């Protein structure tokens, strides 16, 4: 399942440094056919200790963790929605992503001049969010003009409902509230899905701090960002982009040593990946064997048949059933055979809702 987060930010906030850290990740692109690696795209493996345990247990020929794609969205400046900077190019790129990571400068440094002269993370956030809102309003107004006339003429129920939902979105934006804060029904979400509204996408505010502040209490800038994020149910991740860039160039052993020296357990990039995973409601199931141990990303709420289709469409079309054991049972009993002997293995049908950590063998017939 190919999922992408778009990284946005004003000039001199640390976005380029962060993206350097992402693109320095040593990942085998051929293992991820969905990832057409371009200069503005980086792929990061999703940290998962369970995969290391499975690797030890099976000693597979191939070992493929699940991965996440980050896209560097260039051209976001004040006025981007009206064509400033890269304007329309920026808008077309950001509409394609599943989530937005907004890099916010939360450090003081006289050597790095802020585009507006003074460090103010909330002003920066509001500058970017205003551009996203204006872009959404333009789409809404253009569509409303057409569909309203049609609805008045035809009295078509679907058109009338679309007008109602678009008016609701417009009102929210005019009140400085992103569309994601609206309590839309599943039907309403389906109606506006094709528009890929920017302010409907889940968002993470990435607070870029100094190295000396890692592992310490949040500085005043970060506290302001967290307070702002709470109001719109957004997530905040703090990291030092410069440190992440340095970590990305190290071996796993040296990386671990550097993290210990900094007094932190997890890299900021790993925290970012997991936060992105969380806001999109993602989970992982595994396929295991001597030939390959692999992690697969799915959206919570997907059933066994749909999850089989993530591997290959033939698996979904010819789905018969899924042999399922939980990761915890496999670790506790030590082998698939012992799990089966204990009566803990299950045969599940197409409607079974997959759980994070399920280990599956799919039976299918095409």
Predicted regions located by residue number:
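Short, flexible surface segments
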Residues: 96, 355-356
């Amino acid at each position: 399942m190919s999922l992408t987060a778009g990284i946005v930010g004003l000039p001199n906030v640390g976005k380029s440094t962060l993206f350097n850290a992402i693109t320095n990740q040593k990942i085998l692109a051929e293992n991820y056919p969905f990832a057409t690696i371009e200069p503005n795209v980086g792929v990061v493996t999703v940290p998962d200790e369970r995969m290391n345990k499975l690797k030890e247990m099976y000693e597979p020929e191939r070992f493929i963790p699940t991965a996440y794609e980050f896209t560097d969205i260039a051209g976001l400046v004040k006025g981007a929605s009206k064509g400033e900077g890269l304007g329309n190019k920026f808008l077309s790129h950001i509409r394609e992503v599943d989530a937005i990571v907004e890099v916010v400068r939360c450090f003081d440094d006289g050597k790095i001049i802020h585009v507006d002269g003074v460090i103010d993370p909330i002003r920066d956030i509001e500058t970017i969010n205003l551009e996203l809102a204006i872009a959404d309003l333009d789409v809404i107004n253009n569509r409303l003009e057409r569909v309203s006339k049609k609805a008045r003429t035809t009295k078509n129920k679907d058109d009338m409902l679309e007008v109602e939902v678009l008016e609701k979105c417009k009102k929210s934006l005019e009140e400085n509230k992103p569309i994601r804060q609206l309590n839309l029904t599943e039907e309403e979400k389906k109606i506006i899905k094709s528009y890929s509204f920017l302010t409907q996408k889940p968002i993470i505010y990435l607070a870029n701090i100094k190295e000396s502040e890692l592992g310490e209490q949040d500085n005043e800038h970060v506290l302001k960002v967290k307070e702002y994020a709470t109001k719109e149910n957004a997530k905040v991740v703090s990291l030092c982009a410069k440190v992440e860039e340095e970590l990305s160039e190290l071996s796993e052993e040296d990386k671990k040593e550097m993290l210990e020296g900094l007094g932190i357990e997890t890299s900021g990039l790993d925290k970012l990946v997991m936060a992105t995973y969380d806001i999109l409601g993602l989970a992982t199931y595994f396929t295991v064997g001597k030939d390959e141990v692999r992690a697969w990303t799915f959206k919570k709420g997907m059933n066994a048949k749909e999850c089989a289709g993530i591997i290959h469409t033939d698996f979904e079309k010819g789905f018969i059933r899924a042999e399922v054991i939980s990761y915890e049972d496999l670790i506790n009993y030590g082998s698939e055979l012992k799990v089966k002997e204990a009566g803990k293995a299950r045969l599940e049908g197409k409607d079974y809702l997959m759980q994070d950590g399920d280990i599956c063998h799919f039976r299918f017939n095409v």
